[in-house]
Structures are given as C-alpha cells and as structure tokens.
C-alpha cells in the first residue's frame, strides 16, 4: 500500500517502511508523527483520490533524525575586487513510515 502525503508545501509518495526526508516539523527523535493531509491512497485495488484529501486516511511515522542538509554556497564577485560568500543549510526531519490507513 502507498500514499501521497502533503507536508511542508511539498508532496511525497510513501509506502510502509520507507524513510523520507521532509521539511522540518516539530518532534523529538523517536516520537510518533501522524500525517492527515493524504492526497491519494493506492494499493492492490483501485486508488482512492481525494478532493482535495482522502477522508479518514492517515499515515503514521516515527522521527529518526532532526538534521540539516549539506551547505549550499552562494558566491558574489564584483568588478572592484571584493567578494562575498554566503551559505545556507536547510533543516529537515527524517521519518520512517510505520503504517498507512485509509
């Protein structure tokens, strides 16, 4: 069984046992997380498509890590000889999907 969830303004296709990196959400490592914004639930039978979400469906996962992505660097060089270097590390949450109900 698989589902398409929406979290952090993005959509993810997940199945039971998958480990996904999503935009940072609140929760300690080891905590259980429930996603209720389910756009599609599929499996052996015909898929259930929500308009906009599937009623009564939910995906439960376990938080594995709260971390940051690799640094993204931005360089800027002007004609006069000065440079500027900026960096950014986007925080994320790593979640293991434990169950899909729908």
Curated annotation (Swiss-Prot):
GO biological process: translation
Pfam families the record matches: Ribosomal_L21p (PF00829)
The organism's place on the tree of life at top rank: Bacteria
Subunit structure: Part of the 50S ribosomal subunit. Contacts protein L20.
Function (record text): This protein binds to 23S rRNA in the presence of protein L20.
InterPro entries in UniProt: bL21-like, bL21-like_sf, Ribosomal_bL21
Keywords tagged on the record: Ribonucleoprotein, Ribosomal protein, RNA-binding, rRNA-binding
PANTHER family: 50S RIBOSOMAL PROTEIN L21 (PTHR21349), LARGE RIBOSOMAL SUBUNIT PROTEIN BL21M (PTHR21349:SF0)
Gene Ontology CC annotations of this record: cytoplasm; ribonucleoprotein complex; ribosome
Family membership noted in the UniProt record: Belongs to the bacterial ribosomal protein bL21 family.
Protein source organism: Myxococcus xanthus (strain DK1622)
Gene Ontology molecular-function annotations: rRNA binding; structural constituent of ribosome
Protein name as it appears in the record: Large ribosomal subunit protein bL21
